[in-house]
């Protein structure tokens, strides 16, 4: 087998076009990516919101998915189950884009530090190089709109996708860090209960990104 990773539009080093970054656009991009590389079907792996996208592809294009690996996401009733203070503040904010952009310029470093400490259990991983790379990403031109799109996409997730989690029949592995401070372990166990052909794997000494903290187990 081969492993392919991609940065979605608006993420990482990918282009940040002036689009709405709607869930349907992200789904179409992923299917277009598979089409361009002539991949008829594949096993999908997604972390957090990326897990939500993998679920969306599975529900809308079931024949393109062989198996599903969901890491730390994504449940129904996101806001009710979210325990991260930093994520909650970002998702509940109704500030306009210009104000978010100004806040990112003024306080972005503090926010980055807070978010990283919530998603990572082992803080020794948060080296100066990691923090600087994260700060470089948040300073990239055009980053605000895709960040705000995550907030705006939640209603679509709750109405169009989350209610159908129990209809997924693909073999699914759900991986969860035992010290996840974004979505607690119980949230992962509930997701496991809803997806019938799923297995649940607990990762010790890991938070919201166990693939980074415990690559030996994931």
Model-derived regions: residue spans:
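Catalytic histidine-centered segment of alpha/beta-hydrolase-like enzymes
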Residues: 182, 206-217
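Acidic catalytic loop of the alpha/beta-hydrolase fold
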Residues: 154-155, 178-183
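Conserved alpha/beta-hydrolase catalytic His-Asp/Glu region
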Residues: 79-82, 103-167
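Short beta-strand/loop motif that positions the catalytic acidic residue
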Residues: 168, 174-176, 180
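Conserved alpha/beta-hydrolase "acid-adjacent" motif
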Residues: 127, 181-187
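Post-His helix in hydrolase/transferase enzymes
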Residues: 187, 196, 212-218
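Active-site loop/oxyanion-hole signature of alpha/beta-hydrolase fold enzymes
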Residues: 4-49, 81
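Flexible "cap/lid" loop of the alpha/beta hydrolase fold
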Residues: 55, 59-60, 66-101, 105
